[in-house]
Amino acid sequence: MREKRALLLLTALSLVLTLLAGCGNTAPDTGEKTMVIGDTTFNSENWEETVDPHRTYNGWACIRYGIGETLVRYTDSMELEPWLARSWSNDGDRTWTIVLQDNVTFSSGRKMDAAAVKQCLEHLLENHDRAPGDTKIADMQAEGQTLTIVTSQPNPALMNYLGDPYGCIIDVDASDFEKGIVAGTGPYVVQELVTDD
């Protein structure tokens, strides 16, 4: 009985010492930070033929790869917050006024203003199967950094839909849709898109 207790105590002590030894930090903290810059490869079996957010569900790739951003985004608590839009308001019916962030440029170098966003949303409505029915956009007017959208019927969820990945704002003029490459406002630029690699 005494031997069992001694063995149990010795085993417990060994476990505690092993745990404490594993928690130690032998490397000194130099305060230096390392930044590695290079190619970023994501999804080693890439099935996306394009990162054009206005084609099928490729808006997810556009955001995931850091190429594009939307006018609004969702917080962790699923509330809308500004991203490329600075603010927005609705007259309670069909007219929305969206004020855009200043000093945002596309990877092409073009300034993101209301005219560029209007052109982008027109391209979205012409090419995406869900966007026209979701957004119900009937008309848009652009002036400086202010975009006015009129919907065909009241649509209180308009900003939610513009936060969908298909709503990534891209420079339509600088995008190469044949190669599947778009110019967005995100921190990364597409150089080449290789599918099924």
Go through each PLM region and give its residues.
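Residue-level signal for nonpolar/aromatic packing positions in well-ordered secondary structure
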Residues: 15, 37, 71, 87-88, ...
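Short, low-complexity disordered leader/linker segments with a strong preference
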Residues: 1-35, 49, 79, 123, ...
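Extracytoplasmic
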Residues: 30-32, 66, 83-85, 91-93, ...
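N-terminal lobe/hinge region of extracytoplasmic solute-binding protein
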Residues: 38-91, 183-185
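Aromatic- and charge-enriched surface segment that lines or borders ligand/interaction sites
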Residues: 86-128
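Short, well-ordered beta-strand elements
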Residues: 31-43, 95-99, 117-120, 147-149, ...
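Extracytoplasmic/secreted proteins, especially bacterial periplasmic and envelope-associated proteins
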Residues: 62, 66, 79, 83, ...
